[in-house]
Amino acid sequence: MKKEKILVLNFGGQYDQLIVRRVREMGVYAELHECDTNLSEINLDNLAGIILTGGPQSVNDSESPKADSKIFDLGVPVLGICYGHQYINYVNGGTIETPNLAEYGKTDLKVDKESCLFKDIPEESIIWMSLNKQLSLSTFRSVLPYSARFGVSIVPPFT
């Protein structure tokens, strides 16, 4: 049996290599590609999931990076981090807004340990946040009611 792999699509964020390394340290092969790589150029055998990295742009910008929307049809879980989170919402018809006050810096994170997404993350951590865009929670839920698509607007505690 071949080893499962995670496809990491880079949207221009600064943590792409760190994400790949952390996935590999968990015993899962991770492969990094630029977000606009055509899926036909990627070996999708044994694909277990996809991670969409962060990036400095907003999906609302006409020149912002885009991925092949067929990634959502591959039948594997997709995790969007920061920009990747916005992108999942955007591709599925959601909207992204600019809040009145943008913030960046360290903050405390408290997670629900019952969520499969956070089960191996400490209940409390200090994380980096970059909040200059927001999604409406009701929009995100109505766009993706029952799917293995996750998004976080923080840089998870990789270090």
PLM feature spans:
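Flexible gly/pro-rich beta->alpha loop and the following alpha-helix that scaffold active-site loops
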Residues: 2-8, 13-80, 85-86, 92
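Pocket-forming structural segment of enzyme catalytic cores
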Residues: 65-81, 86-159
